[in-house]
Amino acid sequence: MRKWIQLALLVLCFFCLSGAALAASAVTPDGYFNGIRLAGKVRVVDSFPDIRVQVVSAFPDLRVQTVDYFPDDIGQWQFVDYGEDFTVQFVNSFPDIRIQFVNSFPGVP
């Protein structure tokens, strides 16, 4: 009887942890992070960013395509020196979101 209880608790913990991992994405399905639409003109800063970003090669929260003009779709970013929609800081640890640079099909995976 005791083994059944331990097994049931183990299965319950597994489902709780896997559900928390699925809900861990900081980017909403429509491409927003804390009310910031993740498209448009972006300025890279060294301190006090709107979003801290880590570049990864797998399992991103957002796929980003850099463009020169008209960054209208979610995941299309135009890097600028002024007139930005939001600011980012590239970090190696403790990011707000994880991004992957792509050449096509930007957006939320």
Q: Predicted segment positions?
A:
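Bacterial N-terminal signal peptides that target proteins for export
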Residues: M1-A8
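Bacterial N-terminal signal peptides
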Residues: A8-G19
